[in-house]
Each structure stands twice: as C-alpha cells, then as structure tokens.
From Swiss-Prot:
The chain crosses the membrane at residues 434-454. InterPro entries: A/G_cyclase, A/G_cyclase_CS, ANF_lig-bd_rcpt, Cyclic_nucleotide_synthase, Kinase-like_dom_sf, Nucleotide_cyclase, Peripla_BP_I, Prot_kinase_dom. It is found in: Cell membrane; Endoplasmic reticulum membrane. One of its GO terms (biological process) is response to toxic substance. SUPFAM superfamilies: Nucleotide cyclase, Periplasmic binding protein-like I, Protein kinase-like (PK-like). GO terms for molecular function: ATP binding; GTP binding; guanylate cyclase activity; protein kinase activity; toxic substance binding. The protein kinase domain is predicted to be catalytically inactive. This is Guanylyl cyclase C. Keywords: Cell membrane, cGMP biosynthesis, Endoplasmic reticulum, Glycoprotein, GTP-binding, Lyase, Membrane, Nucleotide-binding, Receptor, Signal, Transmembrane, Transmembrane helix. Pfam families: ANF_receptor, Guanylate_cyc, PK_Tyr_Ser-Thr. Guanylyl cyclase that catalyzes synthesis of cyclic GMP (cGMP) from GTP. It comes from Mus musculus. Residues 489-748 form the Protein kinase domain. Glycosylation at Asn-75 and/or Asn-79 is required for interaction with VIP36 while glycosylation at Asn-345 and Asn-402 modulates ligand-mediated GC-C activation.
Length: 1072
C-alpha cells in the first residue's frame, strides 16, 4: 500500500513537468537544421529481441532517411537519441509491470534535455496507455507494439504492428461469411483459449476477444473462455461442447503442447493466430499431422520479406519487431521530409497529429497507415493441403478495406466435402437436408389447415385492432390539494412548474393518472392511429407505464396514463437532496436503473409496438418503489418524434425511427445517469443546437458526450464500454436490448463479487442507508430553519414592536389598545424644502440617511419606540406598547437632549459650512395604538395627543425643545431634575392658548447643546438662506469635493427636479 501511495505521489508531482517539457525541449533538439528522434530502449522479457538489434535497425533506418533527404536537396542533420532503462528505480521484468518505466524514461528525457521531434516506443500496452492517461503528449509517438484496445484512437500514437482491433474485425468478418464455396454457413459461436502465459501480442489479441462488450463478443450468440489446458483438451475431443470453433494464439509448437497426442474430433476447427512467423511460406516447410484441423492466421511473406536485402539482413536472429523499429524510423523521416519541403513547423500540434491516413515507402515496400495511425496489412488465412502437406492460402483479409477475399476454390483440407463444418455441433449439410424434407412434409399438411384459420383470424383481428377504450369525462376526477405532492425532500418546487403546465394530474378508477395531451381536437382518429391506440391498451409490463384509454375534456383529447410519484428520471437526477450520490445514486443503483430501462425496452421491442422513437430521460419515470418505467411510447402516428439530443444521428438526417435508434437514446440516458450531469454533457460544446448539428453532420470521428474513461476502475469500465458500443455511428454495430440486459446482469454480478443478492435485498440495504442519511438531512434542515426563523424575527422586530410581533405569530391578530399616558416626540429640519431645491435627489437621500442613522443610534439607548419618519419629520413615542410608568416623559426628554447635542456637531457633506437646525416638540397624554392594514402593516398612533405633539413642533423655534405643560408636570413628579424655561402663552390650533416651556438640560448631566439663534439671525436666515446654500456650493467646488452623481431614471425630464414630501397645511415648518 505504501509503494502504491508513493507511486501516486510521484505521478502527481511528475505530471506537470511532462505537460510543459515539450515546449522547451523541442526547441533545442528539433530546430535550426538539426532533428532528432528519441528512442526508448526498455529491456523486458516480453520481446526477446536484443536491444542491440533494435539500435542497429534504427541506425540503418537513419542512413536511409539521410540519403532520401540529400536526394531531396534538404541539407539537415538527422540523429537518434537512445534512452536506456538501466538506472531506473521501477525497472520492469516484462510488459505487464512496465507502467512506471515509461513515465520514468520520460522524466529522464526531460531532465537530460534529450527530447527530439518524435518518440519511438514504448512497445508495451500498459506503459503506452499510462503515458497517455497521465500526460498530455503533444508530440508524435511511434510504437512497435501497444496492441491493446486501450491504445486505440490516440491522436498522436502510430502503431507499426497490427493492433488487436484489426484482428478482431477480421474474425467478425470471417464468422459472417456464408457464401464461399468452402464456407456455406455463418458462425455465431466460439471458444477462446487464453492461459495467461502468452507473449505480449497474443495476450492483447486474446484479451480483445475476451472482453464482454467488444465487437467480437457482440456479434456472437455464444462465447466462452478456456483458461486451462484440461478444458481445451476436453472441448477439442469431447462431444459435450457448444461450439466447434476454438480461437487461440501462438505457434504450431504451442498448439501441440496443449493438444498433446489426443485425437481431434473431425468437425473441430482451430483458428491459430500467428501473425509474425514466416516459416509457413518457406519451401522446405512441411505441415505436421496435428495441424490438419488448424487454420493459421498470419501475415503473408511478401509483406515482410519480399525485398531480397530485407531477407538477407533480417534472417540472422532478427524479427518483424526489429523491422518495425526500422519502419518507424523511415516513417519519421518521411514526415520530416514532407513538412520541411512544405516549409511547415515540425514542433507544432499539426506535426504531432500528421502520422496517419498516409502511405510511405518502407524498407520492405509501401506501408499504409489508417486514419487512426495504425498500420494496414493483408492478412492470410492458411490451411494444410492433404495432397502436398504444405500451407496454402484459404482467404485473405484487407484491413484497409475491411474486406475478406476467398482465394481457394476447392481446398483439399481435412473437413468433408471441401467445406468447413458448422460452428454448432451436430449440424451439417446431411442433417439439414433430412430436417428440410421432414419439415416440408409436415408443413404441407398444416398449410391447408392454417389457411382456413388464418382467413378467419385476419377478419376478427382487423375488427379488434380498431377498438380502444374511450373513457367518459365523468369518470375523471381532480385530485385533492394534499394529493398533488410528489415524493421529494427539496424545499422549493420550482423545478416542477414547467411540468405541471404540460401535464395534468387526475384520478381515474381510484388511481392517480396523468393526462397526456395528444394534440387532437375532435377524437376522430385515423385507422392507423386507432390501431396504435389499441396496441397501447394491450401493453402491460412492469417497466412500462399503463395506458388506460383516451378522454375528451373541453375541446381536447388526452391520453390517460399511469402516474409515478417521484417524477421523471431527469428530475430524480437533478434532485441531489432527495437522492444523494452516497446512498441512492451509487453505482449499484445506477446499474439497476439502466437494467429497468433495458427490460422495458426489451419488452417493447418484442411487442406489437416494436419501437419507441422518443426515448429520453424525461420519458422515463420513477414510481414510489424506485422502479423506473418507460412512458410516452406508441403514439408515433399521433405525436411524431422531434429532433433532440437523444435522437440517433441517422434519424437526425432522416426523420425516421428504429430499434437501433432507441439503443442510441439509451446510451445518452446512460451517460446522464453515470455522470449525473446535464443531457449530452461535454466540455467541448455547451450549446444545445450546436450539439445536434455536430451529431447530425459527423465528419471523421463521431461527436459524442464525455464519459471520462480515465477515472473509471475495472468494474465501471465495463459499463462505459457498453455505453460506447450503444452509441456507435454504425447502427448495425449497436447491441440489441436483449444483449444489453444480459451484459448489465453480468456487470451487476461484478459489483457484488458474484454474490447472489436479490433486487429486494439491494433495495432494503439502500433504504437503510437512505434512512440514516435522512436523519442527518432533517437535522441539517432544522438548523437552517432555526437560523432563518431568527433572521425573520429580527427583521420583524425592526419593523414592528416585539410584543406586536409575538401577538401576530401566536394569535394572527393584534388587538388595538388605549394607553392612559404616553409621551410623543416630533422633530423636523428647518429649511428642508429650500435645501432640496439646491440638492440632487441622491444628496437629499444621503443627508436624511446620515441624520436618521445617528438618530436611530440615540433611540437605541432609551426606552422609546420609533414610530416613523415622514420626509424630514422624525416621530418617537414612549410608554407604548409596553407601559413604563412616568419614565416615558423622562426617556423622551433625555433622548431629545441627546439629539439636539448631536445636531450641534453635524455638518452636511454636500453643503459644507451650512448650519443644520431642527425644531423639536414634545407632548404627553392619552393615546390609542394598533396595527393597521394587511400589506405593509404599520403600528400607528391615534388621538389628540399626536396632533398636539405635532403642533408643539410646528410652533417651536430652531434648536429648541418645545414642551407642553402636561409633560413638564410629569417630569416634576420624577426624581430627575430637568432644567426648563417658561416660554409663555402659545397659540395651538385646535386647543387655544396654553403655557409652554423650553427644555434646556439637566442639573446632574452636561449636554453640549448648540446655542439657539437670535431673532436677528432667524430673520437673516429667512432672507439669505438661499445665498448661504449657493455660497456652500461654491466652497465645495473650490475645495475640489465631488458629490455622488445619481443614476437618472426614466421619470427624470429636462427642467427643475421635483421632490415628493408629505406635508399638510398646518405643518408649515419647512417654509419661511
């Protein structure tokens, strides 16, 4: 475990260096007329070729490259740098342990500045795949090996030896042949012998055939892997086998080692893959008798030894592996010459991706690379001629054209009648002939009876097909309010808003149903539509929603369909709260969901409906038992399908539907389930319409969503490979839903380590996890609710008195109350209207905000309640809503003194030097209070005391606290010694003449009160206030201060600014 952790740390630390070393190293070793190729010399037992031979092959290739460059008048230097693995820490013993070795060699290249224009090697699949997985290889890599499927379709990888994919395509094509003179039957079964000790090429060839979701496995009805020689011998000689065909990889000697001296059954065919042996074509080669039942797949001799010099140079201890290194060097020289002649840059990404879809002159003749950078060959299938005991060509396979070409007309091999046997034991031409004659006789007898029965059946069936259930509208009932909720833990339900607009939930026959709009107004369906509705009515399966019939409501026709409480699968995937990844949406559940969809589609394809046509995640719904059901099927004649992200490319080009198109839609849904992201999620494209366009108009590599195969483990990789096979561009390569269903069952067994756990056991275990997660979720939501409640209470307490808020929460109403004695405070700003005339709206708002914020801080230090602000008026009361004895007059008086002290030090920001004067009026008396209104409720005061307090303020003087005699009387009853002066008789509108007072301070406390203006100052202010404001504005401009410019609104027009101010005729204190 420690070593694995260390390896992971090394890879993480090393990876950034690999991503950036290309830009610096290539400029040193691939420019200014000097070009190098870096050759990785990894010593392991998988390839028995001495490294010295490989080096000699590369150097010989460089000699040829230099010669060709000179002939092309290109005066450049071409060399090779050989990097050996002698000093590596993770030196491998064979290819299956060389994962770290390739990365270590890359690090050595980076450190020693040896990286050239291209990289030769490694040859091991594991090492090559790991390098592409952990690094960004922005340079061409040429490999003499890397046969595995995991190395397919790499943008910068070129393979000089045939990969496993090419072999697999040949076997599939050969199995399908049924029109050759020597092979009248197509094969659908096979055994694969793989014991794990094969050489590197055989290991990956057989691994591709063994894979459960490979192309070879998909086209076969039966395939089994034999891993022990005893199993191989039993199949080779026994009668209890399921196929006559066995595929293995190796040499004739390795076949004999496994077979021994056992007698092979006459109808057995062994396909021996031995691509790199040349002795089959030698003149002195005689086939042994144990090879009679063997067909050998190899590369023909002209591909590797047609050149006399090649035969001479590679006959002494060398192999096709050495030739591959030489050919790779020639390929590098060919591309270098091409780019230099065209004046193009050999260090850019174009050069890295140019090693494909071309033909160059190799050492043994022309060499062709396909559009994936893999070599194309002509493979030969050989048989043993009983006449000459020589190997002869039976068929040839062109990997470039993907075409099998029969060569032999009447091959004299061991099988009867010069024909290969059937792959199924016991079936052959003779047995088939007997079966045909027997069945013909029976059919003739039954045919006459069937014709009579068929005629009557067709007549009855035609009448029955046109009938369907039309439900009277009286049988459809709306749901109660408490029945419309769906199963979810999400607090908000906005995500279902659009769905509710499209579908209607009702009740039919005591069951919840959904009304699906059929876009039909009169209900006069055509004959074809009636037949489709009848098929819908007859469909009844566990993973399909039930169709009950049609109903006419108002002027529209609806389909009545079974309702599933948890909504669509797309909604479930979006709801990460109700269905978290750690419990419900784990891999087992995802596979169960895929299996439910596959079962439903498998039944649908085998039913009379035959095809869905609109399969997508929004048409897969989940019921209360977490069973996924398919809906919205069978109405293609009524609701034709539309183009969307789930539509197969062939149906985007032509508006049709097919079962293979449903398989493609299943793959898109599977990608949604696996990644739990948006539909057709891909990092390379986010636009919906562009995705559809790129799928419809695929050029080269088809456009598909992301799957992130790099992060998948072995079990998850099986699911990913299944998904990729389902969205193949060629519909014929996609599996059917029966195959998908069986593959998912095998994958589900892998996640349980082959344990026999039923679906109910899995569901119960998942519900237990879900219950524990729900407890934590409820606790978390409770904490969030309490925090939100406290915030709401705090806001309510800022708007209404605390007692009023509690009464509203507990009773829902607030009873109005009469208070015998309270004190009310009024104040306003002198000259407010004149200030507004010379100020912008934002300056007025800022001024009032600065003043009121300071007033509010003062109010918080006294037992008073701020009632409201009206323009420049500020209203405060004490003694309500909580009574406080005689303290109400004391608290209002102290607050008034504090406010007046603050005003003495306050200065307007936008009018520096301008004095701010306020008038304050205070009165005590009885008052009524209560909450008025429903929208924006306010705690309002009513009574003559409120009006009198307002009159006290309006008849007062600037920087003075004007108090009524009732307030002074209350103050005298307290222990507080306030200082006041008698103003004299003052006329109060509505009350007549009363004696009023000026509050000037307290004996035991100092207040920094501003000096009230004299009568002369007041008169001067009335006449010169506008001039003082203009002078303050000029002073602000001279000092360089800028006021904040307000954002103009639509209601602002040219002319003077206007301000809204609440004012009555009696309250004229803001005017002089």
């Amino acid at each position: 475990m420690t070593s694995l952790l260390g390896l992971a740390v090394r890879l993480l630390l090393f990876q950034p260096a690999l991503m950036v070393f290309w830009a610096s190293q290539v400029r040193q070793n691939c420019r200014n007329g000097s070009y190098e190729i870096s050759v990785l010399m990894m010593d392991n037992s998988a390839y028995k070729e001495p490294m010295q031979n490989l080096r000699e092959a590369v150097e010989e290739g460089l000699d040829i490259v230099r010669k060709r460059l000179r002939e092309a008048d290109l005066n450049v230097t071409v060399n090779a740098t050989f990097i050996y693995s002698d000093g590596l820490i993770h030196k491998s013993g064979d290819c299956r342990s060389s994962t770290c070795e390739g990365l270590d060699l890359l690090r050595e290249i980076t450190r020693d500045h040896k990286m050239g224009c291209a990289l030769m090697g490694p040859s091991c699949t594991y090492s090559t795949f790991q390098m592409y997985l952990d690094t960004e290889l922005n340079y061409p890599m040429i490999s003499a090996g890397s046969y595995g499927l995991s190395c397919d379709y790499k943008e910068t990888l070129t393979r000089i030896l045939p990969p496993a994919r090419k072999l697999m395509y040949f076997l599939v094509d050969f199995w399908k042949v049924n029109n050759a003179s020597f092979k009248p039957f197509s094969w659908n079964s096979s055994y694969v012998y793989k014991n794990g000790s094969e050489p590197e090429d055989c290991f990956w060839y057989l691994n591709a055939l063994e894979a459960g979701v490979s192309y070879f496995s998909e086209v076969l009805n039966f395939k089994d892997v034999l891993r022990r020689s005893e199993q191989f011998q039993e199949i080779l000689t026994g009668h209890n086998r399921k196929s006559n065909v066995i595929v293995m990889c190796g040499t004739p000697e390795s076949f004999y080692d496994v077979k021994g001296d056992l007698q092979v059954a006459e109808d057995t065919v062994v396909i021996l893959v031995d691509l790199f042996s040349n002795h089959y074509f030698e003149e002195n080669t005689t086939a042994p008798e144990y090879m009679d039942n063997v067909l050998v797949l190899t590369l023909p001799s002209e591909q590797s030894t047609s050149n006399t010099s090649v035969a001479e140079r590679f006959s002494s201890g060398r192999s096709d592996f050495s030739l591959a290194y030489l050919e790779g060097t020639l390929l590098f020289g060919h591309m270098l010459q091409t780019f230099l002649e065209n004046g193009e840059n050999v260090t850019g990404p174009k050069f890295a991706r140019a090693f494909r879809n071309l033909t160059f002159q190799g050492f043994a003749g022309p060499v062709t690379l396909d559009d994936s950078g893999d070599i194309d060959n002509i493979m030969s299938l050989l048989y043993v001629s009983l006449d000459t005991r020589k190997y002869k060509v039976l068929m040839k396979y062109d990997t470039h054209k993907n075409k099998t070409i029969p060569v032999a007309e009447n091959p004299n091999f061991i099988w009867k009648n010069h024909k290969l046997p059937n792959d199924v034991p016991g079936l052959g031409p003779q047995i088939l002939m007997i079966a045909v004659f027997t069945l013909t006789g029976i059919l003739v007898v039954l045919l006459l009876i069937a014709l009579l029965v068929l005629r009557k059946y067709r007549r009855d069936h035609a009448l029955r097909q046109k009938k369907w259930s039309h439900i009277p509208s009286e049988n459809i009932f709306p749901l109660e309010t408490n029945e419309t909720n769906h199963i979810s833990l999400k607090i908000d339900d906005d995500r279902r808003r659009d769905t509710i607009q499209r579908v209607r939930q009702c009740k039919y026959d005591k069951k919840k149903v959904i009304l699906k709009d059929l876009k039909h107004s009169d209900g006069n369906f055509s004959e074809k539509q009636k037949i489709d509705l009848n098929k819908l009515l007859q469909s009844d399966y566990y993973n399909l929603t039930k169709f009950y019939g049609t109903v006419k409501l108002d002027t529209r026709i609806f389909g009545v369909v079974e309702y599933c409480e948890r909504g669509s699968l797309r909604e479930v995937l979006n709801d990460t709260i109700s269905y978290p990844d750690g419990t419900f949406m784990d891999w087992e559940f995802k596979i169960s969901v895929l299996n439910d969809i596959a079962k439903g589609m498998s039944y649908l394809h085998s039913s009379k409906i035959e095809v869905h046509g609109r399969l997508k995640s929004t048409n897969c719904v989940v019921d209360s038992r977490m069973v996924v059901k398919i809906t919205d099927f069978g109405c293609n004649s009524i609701l034709p399908p539309k183009k969307d992200l789930w539509t197969a490319p062939e149906h985007l080009r032509q508006a049709t539907i097919s079962q293979k198109g449903d398989v493609y839609s299943f793959a898109i849904i599977a990608q949604e389930i696996i990644l739990r992201k948006e539909t057709f999620y891909t990092l390379s494209c986010r636009d919906h319409n562009e995705k559809i366009f790129r799928v419809e108009n695929s050029y080269g590599k088809p456009f598909r969503p992301d799957l992130f195969l790099e992060t998948a483990d072995e079990k998850e990789l099986e699911v990913y490979l299944l998904v990729k096979s389902c969205w193949e561009e060629d519909p014929e390569k996609r599996p059917d839903f029966k195959k998908i269903e069986s593959t998912l069952a095998k994958i589900f067994g892998l996640f349980h380590d082959q344990k026999n756990e039923s679906y109910m056991d899995t569901l119960i275990r998942r519900l237990q996890l879900y219950s524990r997660n729900l407890e934590h979720l409820v606790e978390e939501r409770t904490q969030l609710y309490k925090a939100e409640r406290d915030r709401a209470d705090h806001l309510n307490f800022m708007l209404l008195p605390r007692l009023v808020v509690k009464s509203l929460k507990e009773k829902g109403i607030v009873e109005p109350e009469l208070y015998e004695e309270v004190t009310i405070y009024f104040s306003d700003i002198v000259g407010f209207t004149t200030i507004c005339k010379y100020s912008t709206p934002m300056e007025v708002v800022d001024m009032l905000n600065d003043i009121y914020k300071s007033f509010d801080q003062i109010v918080d230090h006294h037992d008073v309640y701020k009632v409201e602000t009206i323009g420049d008026a500020y209203v405060v009361a004490s003694g309500l809503p909580m009574r406080n004895g005689n303290r109400h007059a004391v608290d209002i008086s102290k607050m008034a003194l504090d406010i007046l002290s603050f005003i003495g030090t306050f200065e307007l920001e936008h009018l520096p030097g301008l004095p701010v004067w306020i008038r304050i009026g205070v009165h005590s008396g009885p008052c009524a209070a209560g909450v008025v209104g429903i929208k924006m409720p306010r705690y309002c005061l009513f009574g003559d005391t409120v009006n009198t307090a307002s009159r006290m303020e309006s008849t007062g003087l600037p920087l003075r606290i004007h108090m009524s005699s009732s307030t002074i009387t209350i103050l005298k009853r307290t222990d507080c010694q306030f200082l006041y002066e008698v103003r004299g008789e003052t006329y109060l509108k509505g009350r007549g003449t009363e004696t009023t007072y000026w509050l000037t301070g307290m004996k035991d406390q100092e207040y920094n009160l501003p000096s009230p203006p004299t009568v002369e100052n007041q008169q001067r202010l009335q006449t010169e206030f506008s001039d003082m404001i203009v002078s303050a504005l000029q002073k602000r401009q001279a000092s360089g201060k800028k006021s904040r410019r307000p954002t103009r609104v639509a209601s602002y027009k040219k002319g003077f600014l206007e301000y809204m101010q609440l004012n009555n005729s009696d309250h004229d204190s803001t005017y002089f």
